[in-house]
Structures are given as structure tokens and as C-alpha cells.
């Protein structure tokens, strides 16, 4: 960890070198059966879905329930008006075809209003800009080091917080379990909290 704690802060405006959907920090209160909701427009997991006794529950990335709906007695596989969001699949407009994306659970749908709510919560979680020192900013362009910004934010919100291992005041390290390509890692994020700047991040097994 090469940082002094006084590094200049930079905004990241780059493009993700790999898909953000390959990363996940799952809320600790969700069951292992909860299916990730993949939004192809945002290229990210933006929530989770569980079903029990014909009732569907949808959760945001913080594990808060945002929707409870009861399945009708009879329903089509896809409703072209409301059912516009698929779990683990891609919707081809007008073609009524679903193409599977590996590793994201069974085909399923949620309503337009629930999708809008999840996207709103996803955007709201990024209202405070996360900045980077020069070295971690460079890592954001490297496929083998990159971690999506929203995943770093989740680690900061829900990870274990300890004082900076190097002893700098006002700096803290957050540690959270993270899954990448289906493999479990530990994600460490070191943050200067006065200006919300990432000084170091790394994931390891």
C-alpha cells in the first residue's frame, strides 16, 4: 500500500475495462437463493429477487425490500408492456426472444415501476462523488485490478471499518466479502474520509 495520505484527489470518468456485472457484494441479510437482477442498460446487478408461495420480493443492493407482489393465477411468460426486465437474460425488442447470460439465475421478470425504483436507488447511491488518488485511478483502467465504483461504495457502506493500517489520521480501511466471476474475494478499500478519496483498493482470496 503505497500512499502518504496527502495525495491529490481525482474524479474517474473512464470506461469500465470489463463488465461491472461480474462483481457482486451481496447484502448479508439476503438468503443464498436470492437471484441477482441484472440491468443490461447499466451493465450491473442492481437488486435481488426471491419468491415464496407465489409471492415475489424484490430488494435493492442494500438488502432493503422495495416490492412485494403476488403472482396472478395465470400469467404470460412475457408481458410486452410491463415485463421489460429480465433476470439473467437479454430482451430483444419486438422479437420475443430471451438470450441467456451465464451465471445469473433463472428467467424471470419484474414490473416497469419496480425497475424504475431500483434504478432510482442505484443512481441515488452515487450522489456523493467518490474520488481517487493517482495510483488507484490508474488501477481503474486495468482489467485485472478494476472494481466498479458502486461496488467500492457498497464496501464502504457495509464493510468492516478499521483505522488506517499505516496509521494516518482521518483515513480508514473498509473490508467486505466480494464475488468476482463467481469466486469469493476479500475487498479492501482505504479511504480519506474528509474528501471521500480512495487511496488504495485491492481484492484478494
Regions found by a protein language model. Give the residues of each.
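Ribonuclease/tRNase effector modules and their secretory precursors
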Residues: 1-205
